[in-house]
Amino acid sequence: MNFRPYLILPFVAALVPALITLAMGSSPSLATALKMEVFVVRIVALTAALVAANAFDRGDYMQRAWLTYGLAPAFVTIRDLLFTFWLTRESGTPSEYVEALLIFLANAGQIAGVWMLSRAWQIAGIELPGSSQRRALLIGIGTLIGIAVTGPSMVLNLGDALHGEMRGLVALISGIGDIVSFALIVPVVLTALAMRGGLLFWPWGLLTASLAGWLLCDLTGLVRHIVENAAFTLTWRETFRTLACAFCLSAGIAQHAVNSRDIALP
């Protein structure tokens, strides 16, 4: 079974935001075009979770984990649809609270989903490489990396949130979700390493690549405080977002391809 295309195609997909930027240049429609691309890749991420979940029997732990992970793109997609066709982002309107609720639910789903995936090794009785102390240290390092990447933006968003700005609260919720998710990347990486040499390495390895893509996506939030070129940082942000979602789809397809129903977790 050849999984190399699943590794290569996400990098090809990640070229799309750059091609859009090159084609449109400094056009005022660039941001709109990239927003449309973002909507598509969020659908891709949701599809990935559904495809992966379908690889397991109903009620299986891994099915629940993937479906929970899929709540994040599902709620964000609902938010996008509502604010594209119905609601507007005006200060002091109920729509602000609707957006905050949907982002909270999306981040709760993301945290719960990554947490469930990160403890799959325990459910399956797999021995992870390294001692428990070393794993705890690596999780601590992952947490610090998450704080370093999202911290500066969160400080600004905290100030906005304290002044009653719902957008600041929404961004703050997203930042907290990202920090927790980054801390949980470590068990996912170690699970992939424990699976090396077998077919199950591929879905876990590709999932690791997806989570790394999200880390790079959030890193652009730090870069935009240094680089004043908004189009530059926006393009890179959407490039890494696309990479993360495409790798997630590859992971979902790979999970399904290895016929996981025969090796489903209890």
Q: Where do the protein language model's features map onto the residues?
A:
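Polytopic alpha-helical membrane-helix bundles and their juxtamembrane interface segments
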Residues: 1-266
